């Protein structure tokens, strides 16, 4: 009898347990570090009071959780605890949490709001990265440290309380936050690392930065709606690509402290029309203002010493150019494609005009080259300058690169100097208006296609020391080989075209 009663009691206990949990579908689990929780069938996560730590990756990729309640007993959340909880929409946070760790809510794509308490002092690396519906984060004013990628690709984030005590904004911290419209950098911030705000395409106003001394590359790259930018007052250099592709920017004022513009700093700022207070700039890097289509002028200081390659390439509206006397080289493609330039005076201090330096300046009519330091005009330096009419090459020049005046279709006359020993390949290629060129007495060779398609070149005298004429040198040009001197020892079969 006693045995029968015991069996009945056990049966009733089992039945009661099954009944209690079958209706509400709770999953009760006891986990490590004394954290007990339950997830209801409706997706509510309850963590029992008394637990202090949510372990690493405890709920990673859990698709059942929709709402999480984290009680005040919890003081620590370990990294990746809620990573990939793609259906999580709401979190009620413990007010005793001091850190949101690495990957904590990464890729929680349904999370739309996060309210933190002043107890939070650190937001770790990628803590909210990829939370694409997160539109508001509050309670962050006491945060002292942000991690890399902390809010990267939070594409709908519109409100964020910028921490007032953060010294460093790390790389990619807010990259891709396309819905942010304004940002004010706190006074405590002294460093902004690479691409911190890159791709914030809705950002219109960038203020603060007055104490920022170190700028990473590309910090505001592709913030293509930014119209108001306050530059830092404590740095001497604008970093590489820091404001490139800020397409809505029309005016920028350079503070007195900045002396160097880094490579591609303003490249692709298509509507940048005016650069104010550039008097202290001494160096401009590669492509710094390339593709600034609206830029009309740039005032160089007397202390300016260095251009980079393509510094002002494709500045279509640049009408006037006063090249500083403190430089010795105009680098490759420095002013190529500046189609509004009509007149150019190269200072006597310039030693080298590098490859394609003024290529495709299609409205350049007047070019003055001063004798003195200039020794080299390199390959394609003035190629495709279709409005250029006359050129005098100074006596100091002893090197012409290939295609220097290629496709200068309005070029009529060129005076070459006596120091030249060759006419390189394609020097006057397709100069269809060219009528007069003096070939200096020291020239020994005329290169391939040097005078190709020069149909107006009716009268050309060859020097007595000429030895070599390259392929197609005079093809489609009315120059007779009958006038060749006896000194010629090598002439390509098709030098004057094919019969």
Segments from the language model and where they lie:
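Bacterial N-terminal signal peptides that target proteins for export
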Residues: 1-11
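Short intrinsically disordered, low-complexity coil segments enriched in acidic
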Residues: 1-3, 452, 497
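Structural signature of tandem-repeat unit edges
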Residues: 7, 40-52, 63-76, 86-99, ...
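Bacterial N-terminal signal peptides
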Residues: 11-20
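Sec-dependent signal peptide cleavage junction
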Residues: 19-32
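Short, exposed beta-strand/loop patches in secreted or surface proteins that constitute
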Residues: 34-40
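Consensus positions within tandem repeat domains that build extended binding/scaffold surfaces
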Residues: 57, 78-81, 101-104, 124-129, ...
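Right-handed beta-helix
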Residues: 57-63
């Amino acid at each position: 009898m006693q045995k029968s009663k015991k069996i009945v009691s056990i049966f009733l206990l089992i039945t009661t347990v099954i009944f209690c949990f079958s209706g509400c579908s709770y999953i009760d689990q006891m986990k490590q570090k004394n954290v007990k929780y339950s997830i209801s069938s409706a997706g509510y996560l309850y963590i029992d009071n008394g637990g202090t730590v949510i372990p690493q990756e405890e709920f990673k990729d859990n698709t059942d959780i929709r709402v999480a309640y984290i009680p005040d007993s919890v003081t620590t959340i370990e990294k990746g605890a809620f990573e990939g909880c793609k259906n999580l929409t709401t979190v009620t946070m413990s007010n005793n949490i001091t850190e949101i760790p690495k990957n904590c809510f990464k890729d929680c794509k349904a999370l739309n709001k996060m309210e933190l308490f002043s107890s939070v002092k650190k937001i770790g690396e990628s803590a909210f990265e990829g939370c694409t519906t997160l539109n508001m984060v509050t309670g962050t004013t006491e945060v002292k440290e942000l991690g890399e990628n902390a809010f990267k690709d939070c594409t709908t984030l519109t409100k964020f309380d910028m921490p007032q005590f953060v010294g460093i904004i790390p790389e990619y911290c807010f990259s891709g936050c396309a819905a942010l419209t304004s940002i004010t950098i706190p006074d405590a911030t002294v460093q902004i690392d690479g691409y911190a705000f890159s791709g914030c395409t809705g950002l219109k106003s960038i203020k603060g930065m007055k104490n920022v001394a170190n700028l990473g590359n590309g910090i505001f790259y592709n913030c293509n709606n930014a119209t108001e930018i306050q530059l830092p007052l404590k740095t001497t250099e604008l970093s590489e690509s820091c404001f490139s592709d800020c397409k809505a920017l029309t005016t920028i004022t350079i503070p007195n402290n900045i002396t160097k513009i880094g490579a591609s700093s303003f490249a692709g700022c298509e509507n940048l029309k005016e650069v104010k207070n550039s008097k202290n700039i001494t160096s401009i890097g590669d492509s710094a203002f390339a593709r600034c289509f609206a830029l009309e002028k740039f005032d160089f200081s007397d202390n300016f010493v260095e251009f980079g390659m393509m510094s002002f390439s494709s500045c279509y509206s640049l009408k006037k150019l006063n090249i500083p006397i403190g430089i010795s080289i105009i680098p490759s493609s420095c002013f190529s494609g500046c189609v509004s330039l009509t007149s150019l005076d190269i200072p006597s201090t310039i030693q080298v005009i590098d490859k394609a330096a003024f290529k495709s300046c299609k409205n350049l009519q007047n070019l003055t080259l001063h004798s003195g330091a200039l020794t080299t005009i390199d390959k394609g330096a003035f190629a495709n300058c279709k409005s250029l009419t006359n050129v005098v090459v100074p006596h100091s020049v002893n090197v012409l690169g290939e295609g220097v005046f290629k496709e200068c279709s309005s070029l009529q006359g060129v005076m070459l100097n006596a120091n030249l020993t060759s006419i390189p390949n394609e020097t006057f290629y397709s100069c269809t208006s060219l009528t007069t060129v003096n070939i200096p007495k020291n020239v020994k060779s005329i290169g391939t296609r040097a005078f190709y398609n020069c149909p107006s070149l009716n009268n050309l005298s060859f020097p007595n020391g000429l030895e070599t004429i390259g392929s197609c040198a005079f093809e489609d040009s009315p120059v007779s080989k009958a006038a060749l001197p006896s000194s010629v020892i090598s002439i390509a079969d098709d030098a004057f075209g094919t019969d």
